[in-house]
Structures are given as structure tokens and as C-alpha cells.
């Protein structure tokens, strides 16, 4: 099975599972997807994730996070840079998501990181997605 936008597929699976109040979601694995999952975990948007080495590609099980009244930790997650239109931003143009209430995930020359970290290290890069 081939996807035009594997990162967009991962984000859509997370959004749909979160809106349906599922406990877990399974996505095909890649190094970039694992790094995005690490950032989401470190920022408190997901509980945890586990990488499975099943088959040639493997998979990632993402455990979603909810508040006490079953409200999802992820209100929305949007893909910004797409295969048909890549969006690169310099350091001074990195957006602030909801005035700091959300995060922007960037792929930089120093790895995948959140907007706050990219500003601190003074690096720009490809704006993968925004989460709040």
C-alpha cells in the first residue's frame, strides 16, 4: 500500500481516533513518524507510543491522552507542509500557535523539534504541522 503523504496519514489517524475517543491508534512506522510521536509525547499531547518491528516496515501504537471528562488532549492537529506545497520558514517567521498554547513541529537541520526549541537554537526548517 502506498501513500502520497504518510505524515498527513499519521496526523489524520491521530485526529480521527482522538475525536472518536479511541484509546490507541496504529500507524505504519518510519523514523520521522517516531520522532514526531516523541515530540507529541514530550509536549504532553499523547500518553506514550510503542514501536513494533512487525514486517519490513513496522508499526507504531500511539496511546492517546484524555482529560478526566474524556476530552482529548489534542483539540486539533493540522498538516502545514504538504508534498505538493512544502512550507519552509526561517527562524524569525516560525509561527506561534494560539499564542503559545499550541505547538508547531519543524524538521530542521538539527532534527525534528517544536517551535520554541527551534527559536532558542536559532534554526528554521520545514513546518510539518501545528497542534493544539
Curated annotation (Swiss-Prot):
It holds the Pfam family Ribosomal_S8. The gene is rpsH. GO terms for cellular component: ribonucleoprotein complex; ribosome. It comes from the Bacteria. One of the primary rRNA binding proteins, it binds directly to 16S rRNA central domain where it helps coordinate assembly of the platform of the 30S subunit. InterPro entries: Ribosomal_uS8 (IPR000630), Ribosomal_uS8_CS (IPR047863), Ribosomal_uS8_sf (IPR035987). Signal peptide: none annotated. It comes from Anaeromyxobacter sp. (strain Fw109-5). The lineage of its organism: Bacteria, Pseudomonadati, Myxococcota, Myxococcia, Myxococcales. GO terms for molecular function: rRNA binding; structural constituent of ribosome. Part of the 30S ribosomal subunit. Contacts proteins S5 and S12. Keywords: Ribonucleoprotein, Ribosomal protein, RNA-binding, rRNA-binding. This is Small ribosomal subunit protein uS8. GO terms for biological process: translation. Belongs to the universal ribosomal protein uS8 family.
Amino acid at each position: 500500500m502506498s501513500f502520497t503523504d504518510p505524515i498527513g496519514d499519521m496526523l489524520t489517524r491521530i485526529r480521527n481516533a482522538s475525536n472518536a475517543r479511541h484509546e490507541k491508534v496504529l500507524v505504519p512506522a518510519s523514523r520521522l513518524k517516531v520522532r514526531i510521536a516523541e515530540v507529541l509525547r514530550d509536549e504532553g499531547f499523547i500518553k506514550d507510543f510503542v514501536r513494533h518491528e512487525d514486517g519490513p516496515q513496522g508499526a507504531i501504537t500511539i496511546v492517546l491522552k484524555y482529560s478526566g471528562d474524556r476530552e482529548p488532549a489534542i483539540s486539533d492537529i493540522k498538516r502545514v507542509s504538504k508534498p505538493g506545497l512544502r512550507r519552509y520558514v526561517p527562524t524569525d517567521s516560525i509561527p506561534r500557535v494560539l499564542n503559545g498554547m499550541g505547538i508547531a513541529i519543524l524538521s530542521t537541520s538539527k532534527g525534528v523539534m517544536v517551535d520554541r526549541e527551534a527559536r532558542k537554537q536559532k534554526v528554521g526548517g520545514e513546518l510539518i504541522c501545528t497542534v493544539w
